[in-house]
Design a protein with these regions (language model features):
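Positively charged, low-complexity intrinsically disordered leader regions
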Residues: 30-45
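N-terminal glycine-rich anion-binding loops that anchor highly charged ligand groups
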Residues: 43-54
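Charged, compositionally biased N-terminal leader segments and the immediate start
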Residues: 1-32
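Cofactor-binding active-site loop characterized by glycine-rich and histidine/acidic residues
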Residues: 53-185
């Protein structure tokens, strides 16, 4: 049987083991991120990809929808923002959520996402209703696979930032200098 994800994963592993890397015009020293940050981002991207592979292998034992492969770069968006910057995510942005939860510390992104894939009642964001990306602790409202239903929510959240400043709310949930992120596609 032709299994493209496994073929790609094995080819990648062989090239890394052989130190067979493509030539690059950039290097870690020329980047604005420290090398350990780049490794951490790569780790989040690999975690996201391996969650997809795990879910494919668990077919029939877990709930599974479209994977996050191809959206691994969103981990960089998470690294470039704060855990208090609200993020309304595309349903395939698992790498963002993994990186955001790692930044917050004390959270278990892979365990939580496995619970979500299995529609477990112990899933901390959906309680077993569906594969959902989200985390209350890191200001990522839950988002299922409904296409673009989170866009109006993101606009409302962004509007609320200005309102909170104009009203000089001392107990606003988000910091006064927060930004609202929204990914879609």
């Amino acid at each position: 049987m032709f299994d493209r994800p496994t073929i790609l994963d094995e080819a990648f592993s062989r090239r890394v083991a052989a130190h067979d890397f493509p030539d690059s015009r950039n290097n870690a020293a020329s980047q604005s991120f420290a090398p350990h940050v780049l490794v951490d981002l790569f780790d989040s991207q690999i975690m996201s990809r391996h969650l997809d592979l795990w879910a494919r292998r668990s077919k029939g034992k877990t709930f599974y929808s479209i994977g996050s492969s191809g959206h691994e770069g969103t981990a960089a968006m998470a690294a470039a923002t704060r855990t208090t910057d609200m993020a309304f995510l595309h349903y395939r942005d698992a790498a963002f959520l993994i990186q955001r939860k790692k930044q917050a510390g004390g959270l278990t992104p892979l365990h939580d996402m496995a619970l979500s894939f299995a529609a477990s009642a112990d899933d901390p964001i959906s309680g077993g209703r569906h594969k959902v990306l989200g985390c209350a602790h890191t200001f990522v409202p839950p988002q299922t696979s409904t296409i673009a239903s989170h866009l109006p929510k993101a606009v409302g959240a962004a509007h609320s930032l200005g309102m909170a400043q104009r009203l000089q709310l001392a107990d606003a949930v988000l910091p006064h200098d927060a930004i609202i992120l929204c990914s879609f596609g």
